[in-house]
Regions:
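Short alpha-helical DNA-recognition segment
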Residues: 26-46
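Residue-level signal for the short linker/turn that defines the boundary of a DNA-recognition helix
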Residues: 27-29, 55-58
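Residues within the helices of the helix-turn-helix
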Residues: 22, 31-32, 61
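DNA major-groove recognition helix of helix-turn-helix/homeodomain DNA-binding modules
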Residues: 58-74
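DNA-binding alpha-helical recognition surfaces that contact promoter or target DNA
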Residues: 19, 23, 46, 65, ...
Length: 86
């Protein structure tokens, strides 16, 4: 299956998502949060740094659960800045 390249807006959204997840992680270790979400620490590292700007929905659900962040909050972070402002 061929993936369509992400638009610059989607890449920027991925960076915002990663930054929000990193902030929510706080003092918790990357390893502990990754384990709780059922993903590898490397996957979480890539998401937090924006190198994986479009993670799987199940990954986001797991991170939402372990970080006690509502999915709606993460969706707001992901939405384009112009859409969030309207």
């Amino acid at each position: 299956m061929v993936r369509t390249p992400l638009s610059p807006e989607q890449v920027a959204a991925g960076r915002r998502l990663g930054a929000a997840l990193r902030a929510a992680r706080g003092a918790r270790t990357l390893e502990d949060v990754a384990r709780g979400a059922g993903i590898s620490p490397e996957t979480l590292r890539k998401i937090e740094t924006g190198r994986l700007p479009s993670p799987a929905f199940g990954t986001i659900v797991g991170l939402s659960d372990v970080l006690d962040l509502p999915l709606e909050t993460l969706a707001e972070v992901w939405r384009p800045v112009s859409a969030a402002a309207s």
